Amino acid sequence: LVDIASKIQALFLLPPGIIIVTALLGFLIQIRWLLAGSFIVALSFAALLILSLPFTGQRLMADIESRISPLRLTDAADGGPAPGAIIILGGGRYTEAPEYGNRDSVSQVTLERIRYGAHLHRLTGLPILVSSGSPYGEQVPEAELMKTALESDFQVAVKWIESQSANTLENARYTKIMLAQAKVRRAYLVTHAFHMPRAVWSFENEGIHTIPAPMGFTTLNKEDRETLGYFPSASGLHLSSIALREHLGMLWYKLKHGKVKFSPATKPATAN
């Protein structure tokens, strides 16, 4: 319930929710103070326009993703313990998928993560741990869906299933227990690039040494880079919303946990 409440609050702090609320506030203020209310309404629509540009979304994402580098496997021996596992974080589910007999499946975001996790497994031969629970009380934990997809679609076995977590901090907390029992001191961590800085901090805070294995970096196609990126679109607003949500998440970590740094200087050494 706490996780649901936090997500509802985020809806009103992120676009388009916050823009709608601000615009409505402006319309109400217009009743008594026409000029001030009109300014707030105009500012709201200007914000909507700017945040709907794919170029804006890409720049907001780049501010996060530039804190982390793509994984290179040429030399993982950087003086730290050898990695003993691959941790893949869940990213949501596809609820009651009609094409799969109305059974839940992994979302597109989660599918992208397990695909890269399977790729990394084939390169390293390391066992896989999938991590995600049932934050909204679903009958089948997301980690179970990830295991099914990895084994049936990618022919990759899953060794550990962490199915209690409802957020990134809990991913780290419950994963720590499993890895400690298996005497794994360090692991590759797979999640989207925009989520990686916060994920790395969460795991390091629990004492789990990770090698970030980010995927899904934000790129613009040729049309968006040259022309369409400067025209508002629903996809542009969606991209901006994802980036701002992650910025909001990092701000919350700083407020809740004190001195938190999401920067290249604080990330663990990567393989290179």
Task: Go through each PLM region and give its residues.
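A structural signal for short, hydrophobic/glycine-enriched beta-strand patches
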Residues: 50-233, 240
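Hydrophobic membrane-insertion alpha-helices, especially the h-region
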Residues: 39-54
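Extracytoplasmic/luminal low-complexity segments enriched in Pro/Gly and acidic/polar residues
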Residues: 224-231, 236-272
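Membrane-embedded alpha-helical segments of integral membrane proteins
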Residues: 1-29
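Hydrophobic alpha-helical segments of integral membrane proteins
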Residues: 1-9, 56, 60-64, 244-251
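Membrane-interface helix-boundary motifs at transmembrane edges
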Residues: 29-37
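Alpha-helical transmembrane segments of polytopic integral membrane proteins
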Residues: 21-22, 53, 57, 257
